Amino acid sequence: MTADQRFLVATGMRNEGPFIVEWVCWYRMLGFDILVATNDCTDYSTDLLNAFAAAGWLTHVPHKPREGQPPQRSTLRKVIKHPMTSAADWVLHCDVDEFLVLHKHDTIAELIGPPPYDFQAMVFNWKCFGNGDWDKYQDGIVHRQFRRCGMGHLRFNRSIKTILRKPLEFNRLGAHFPHGFHGDWSAADNRVVTPSGATLPQFQTRENHPIRMTTQD
């Protein structure tokens, strides 16, 4: 962490035991605090996460989705209400199979830079990888096993993930982009940018339909 800014990555998990260590180490390497919400685990995930929590590596909170409620939506509601979110300056939501790759920086603090900021959020392309011609599970490091992906111009590689500033200024988080901004998107310091610093044009056309993909490289 920098002295001035706290970066939080939040995720929901259920029975992700074999993949937890790699994911946690990856995001700690990038400089994130980690918040994990689990539901209905039947493997050793909760024991492992509790051990990480006892060591101070992350915060683990259980949650129970309501009947008929998608687990991810329950997770995101749990996250937005958690004290770690209110204490964070920047929040990123990622699943356990999603790894943020920084090409020109070693940490998220180096990429975002010091305050003051003239942008509200930064978006990253969500690149999809295939199964590497494997037809069954094999133990190993995820980011080294699956290295083949679709070309960048394909539609499924146009989706985004978002790290956002002042998360409590939104009604709720989203898998790709948050919902219900309380501020004014037209304000100069509420831009949405790419990692290169370019402003993303027309990133939100209607209040209830936030961006999920971009046509920019």
Predicted regions and their residues:
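Active-site-proximal specificity loops/subdomain of glycosyltransferases
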Residues: 44-91
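Anion (oxyanion) recognition and catalysis
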Residues: 28, 54, 116
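Hydrophobic targeting segments
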Residues: 5-11, 26-28, 33-37
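Short beta-strand-to-loop acidic/aromatic patch adjacent to the donor-nucleotide binding site
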Residues: 88-101
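Short beta-strand/loop segment that forms part of the nucleotide-sugar
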Residues: 32-40, 61-65
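Active-site beta-to-alpha loop of glycosyltransferases that engages the nucleotide-sugar donor
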Residues: 11-25, 40
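Catalytic-site signature of metal-activated, phosphate-bearing donor transferases
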Residues: 72-74, 102-217
